[in-house]
Amino acid sequence: MRLIPLKSASQVGLWSARYIVDRINGFKPTAERPFVLGLPTGGTPLNTYKRLIELHKAGEVSFQNVVTFNMDEYVGLPEDHPESYHSFMHNNFFSHIDIRPENINILNGNAPDLVAECKRYEDKIKSYGKIHLFMGGVGNDGHIAFNEPASSLSSRTRVKTLTEDTRIANSRFFGGDMEQVPKLALTVGVGTLMDAEEIMILVTGHGKAQALQAAVEGSVNHMWTISTLQLHPKGMMVCDEPSTMELKVKTVRYFQQLEAANIGRL
């Protein structure tokens, strides 16, 4: 597993955006052979989306032949609700780039049959062969997407009950009222993520330090779903300095030396 230790959340956003642009451009996607990109929501990737928009407007990348799959969506929120992940993605990314609407894939949390919707989503991903790069974030408790602690490490896209900790954390988007946060969500599974050709996890802030430590220095453990990244042949974590506070100094120095050339690309 790779660890890219940077100074700030802003640097994490810039580095990850440039990495995505380089992957897309290197792939040379066409309508018949699109680049397939997995995407998250939440506060952490906002810097990345901002930088991607800037790079697109500067003419450095086109998303016309990029197909996206989002990680998750709340159950029961209308798509046009301000806190739905459909709204989040439209407002913070999709409406600012040249992606084709038919290439955007987000789970439908209002589908009449949620189990069938999850199977449809898995089948749609498989129809493209694989996701080439899945970008994600991580929760304070180590969850990826809505794969909460004790999730099966081979899980597929499914309905999940959100923990109280996750609902409290997300209540900041709902006026601080946890009761307004849905109790259920649809989410890609850990196994779904692991099927991607490459996974890039963004980690910023002191609150994520314990999760980063578990992912990098701990054992693979279903109580820390992020630790599954150790088993991926192309797993990478891009982190800022505050999030490394629980790592051993020698661990951080090791990756600083190992990735010096890549860090220097900023």
From Swiss-Prot:
A single GO cellular-component term on record: cytoplasm
Entry EC no(s): 3.5.99.6
Chain ranges passing through the membrane: none
Regulation acting on activity, per entry: Allosterically activated by N-acetylglucosamine 6-phosphate (GlcNAc6P).
InterPro entries membership: Glc/Gal-6P_isomerase, Glucosamine6P_isomerase, Glucosamine6P_isomerase_CS, NagB/RpiA_transferase-like
Active site: 72, 141, 143, 148
Domain of life from the UniProt record: Bacteria
UniProt-recorded Gene Ontology molecular function terms: glucosamine-6-phosphate deaminase activity; identical protein binding
Top EC class of this enzyme: hydrolase
Keyword Hydrolase: yes
Protein's UniProt keywords contain Protease: no
Function: Catalyzes the reversible isomerization-deamination of glucosamine 6-phosphate (GlcN6P) to form fructose 6-phosphate (Fru6P) and ammonium ion.
Family, similarity comment: Belongs to the glucosamine/galactosamine-6-phosphate isomerase family. NagB subfamily.
Quaternary structure and interacting proteins, as annotated: Homohexamer.
Stated name of the protein: Glucosamine-6-phosphate deaminase
Classification lineage: Bacteria, Pseudomonadati, Pseudomonadota, Gammaproteobacteria, Aeromonadales
